[in-house]
Amino acid sequence: MATVRLDQKARALIRAIPDSYHSALAKFFGTGPKDIETARNQHNAYKSALESAGIEVFMLEADHNHPDCLFVEDQAVIIDGHVLLPVPGHPSRVNEQPPIADFLVREMGGAQICRMSGDARMDGGDILRLG
């Protein structure tokens, strides 16, 4: 979600936690997942909180081949109906993007969708939107 108020949001996209979550990249930084069931319970609580706030929540299936797939914010940047699909910073995350891109193409009907190319790499979660 961008840095705007929750009451300005109508829809959210999340992805289920894969069985492989214990191998997520965060574990290499010493802060990785400890308990998948706890993570799933927290994720369900997050989904419920969004729904309680009146947000329509779409949940994509987990991809058990990609432990980081639940971090959907890294796979797209959406501002004012424009979508940027970045090349993820870590090569292991590149194949997480197609289901998210397909969803955005389908759900955002006439949105301008741009894909990064070349050697540039970026995770969408590294973007801070101001104003």
What are these regions (language model features)?
Residues 1-131:
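The feature marks the mature, well-folded catalytic cores of soluble enzymes
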